[in-house]
Amino acid sequence: MIIHTLELSSYRNYSKTAVVFGEKINVFVGENAQGKTNLLEAIYVVALAKSHRTQKDKEMIGFEEPFARIHAKAEKRTGEVELDIILSAKGKKGKINGLEQRRLSDYVGTLNVVMFAPEDLDLVKGSPQVRRRFIDMELGQISPVYLNSLSLYGKILKQRNVLLKNMQQKRSQNYAMVDVLTEQLIDKAAFVMKKRAEFISRLEEWATPIHQSISRGKEMLTLSYIPSIEVSDIENMSKIKEDLYKAYETKRETEVRRGTTLFGPHRDDVSFSVNGLDVQSYGSQGQQRTTALSVKLAEIDLIYAEIGDYPILLLDDVLSELDNYRQSHLLEAIQARVQTFVTTTSTSGLDDSVLAEACLFSVDQGTVKRLE
């Protein structure tokens, strides 16, 4: 898939901007704080209806502006498509070919992107929340059913936590309602956990050989989904539900005392191991970076395998974080298959093969210009 044009209105430091992109590699050059990352973020938002940098939509709306709009014209294997995201204080709306979508989960997945930013190097060494968010964003864009179930899980979880907090503070002792919400929560939780485990298993199929190649055959990467409770069979929905019921039943009084839900997908994690050793605890910085790079490249292949179209790749100031060997592996992996967007403060750190195929743009104080 390819984005041909992007139009921004009142988006961060872009008052009104339109950019026409090249079909292969697009490089945005400029000093820090000029709007390069904002540009890549806009592509990410128009695809996934969420930012990779903030959870507050108002931060993306221009100063004292009522709303921001991102409009993209793209081409997929199935044909051309126009996408709109409108951000306002009232929320956000997504349109496909001018038609507003009833739910954002119906919108997400029309355009697929893979983002690789410096903070993604924290995928391995960061908190479990970072890894859960990674799964949710990547799996969500290829499975609307997963995204919808995750959203419903979040709503039920919020209700249950409010009730547990009230019970902790003696404002309510409604155990019957806790049981009702627990049953609803388990139904969604089991589906989310099963789909996440399947996704990690699929991702491992692609990431392991990539990691072997980058490490010159010296390292074997394995990925594991780690539920917050002991699950006898993560591939079996009924077994997951049974194990969740047991956990909630055993710890119900503890949850009331703590005023919060102690188990479920919102507390699960992913582990990365190299040659049997946990990379987060025992891996070198080089191994952690190779693992993050392998996982990101695996995403590209997994999305292609799922939908038959390559995603768009966003490289936000990340090439400078990789040595020449890892950089060359990244560039070799994308070749001419993937439309790529790169931000950098200088072209001096970029491989000559990149510059030979790239469309170059300067970014200065929210103004984007094509360099001939």
Curated annotation (Swiss-Prot):
User: Which sites bind ATP?
Assistant: G30, E31, N32, A33, Q34, G35, K36, T37
Q: Where are the membrane-spanning stretches?
A: none
- One Pfam family here: SMC_N
Q: Which UniProt keywords apply?
A: ATP-binding, Cytoplasm, DNA damage, DNA repair, DNA replication, DNA-binding, Nucleotide-binding, SOS response
Q: Please give the chief subcellular localization of this protein.
A: cytoplasm
Question: Molecular function (GO) terms listed?
Answer: ATP binding; single-stranded DNA binding
One term under GO cellular component: cytoplasm
Instruction: Quote the subcellular location field of this record.
Output: Cytoplasm
Taxonomically, which superkingdom?
A: Bacteria
Q: Which residues form a coiled coil?
A: none
Q: Which Gene3D superfamilies match?
A: P-loop containing nucleotide triphosphate hydrolases, RecF/RecN/SMC, N-terminal domain
Has the keyword Repressor been applied to this entry? no
Q: Which GO terms describe its biological process?
A: DNA replication; DNA synthesis involved in DNA repair; double-strand break repair; SOS response
Q: InterPro entries from the xrefs?
A: DNA-binding_RecF, DNA-binding_RecF_CS, P-loop_NTPase, RecF/RecN/SMC_N, RecF_2
Role, per record: The RecF protein is involved in DNA metabolism; it is required for DNA replication and normal SOS inducibility. RecF binds preferentially to single-stranded, linear DNA. It also seems to bind ATP.
The record's similarity note reads: Belongs to the RecF family.
In Swiss-Prot or TrEMBL terms, this protein is called DNA replication and repair protein RecF
Whichever gene encodes this chain, its name is recF
